[in-house]
Amino acid sequence: MKSKLSKVVLLFMCLALLNSPLAVQAKEGSGDPQQQESLKPKEVKLQGDMRRAWIDHMIWDRGYMVSALAGLKDQDKVLARLLKNQEDIGNIIKPYFGEEAGNKLTALLKEHIQIGGKVIDAAKKKNEADLKKFNADWFRNADDIAKFLSSANPNWTEQELKDLLYKHLQLLTEMLQARLKKDWDADIAAFDKGEDHIIVLADVLTEGIIKQFPNQF
């Protein structure tokens, strides 16, 4: 009797696990067969490198923002690391678009960082005129990046890239405003959203490269 009862309990436990949220997510995640196709090793590497570089972009963006607003002694060191990250991103596209294109992207991204530093400084000093000016310049730089990338790859539309970059700036601004208000929950939430979004941007870039250069994968 005890043995039969144990078997019944075990059966119900198995059924419960099969219908648990994780099991449901696993089924949903399997999706359509095309999405289950294995990525080629070189595609996996590009995706990983691109995601890592852009996640680093968010991490060091935040690190610099924290340091600059608090006037910490590590500000210059953090800025140097953040600027190096833009070189890392430029280097990722060099095997596909060449040295000149990679350096051009790096230069545009470094400008993005430099303008962002001015935005942070103006916001910290509550200088509304400068904040408005530098914010407009920030979006102009985003337009330049979108235009450059879309001209290099027809799989990246200028409007799609603008939308992605504008969203990135919006989330950085949310993070900045939250830190200035000392609203730490909002700051963390903005960073989490920013990190999720930057992975989307990275994957769009990866997908475009794979489509344009299938023979390299």
Question: Where are the predicted features?
Answer:
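Mid-length scaffold segments of soluble, non-membrane domains
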Residues: 99-134, 138-140
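Early exported N-terminus immediately downstream of N-terminal targeting peptides
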Residues: 58-88, 93, 101-111, 116
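C-terminal segment of classical bacterial N-terminal signal peptides
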Residues: 16-25
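C-terminal amphipathic alpha-helix
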Residues: 33-35, 42-47, 51-68, 82, ...
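Membrane-helix exit/interface motif
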Residues: 90-97, 116-124, 146-150
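Bacterial N-terminal signal peptides that target proteins for export
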Residues: 1-10
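Cleaved targeting-peptide boundary
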Residues: 26-34, 38
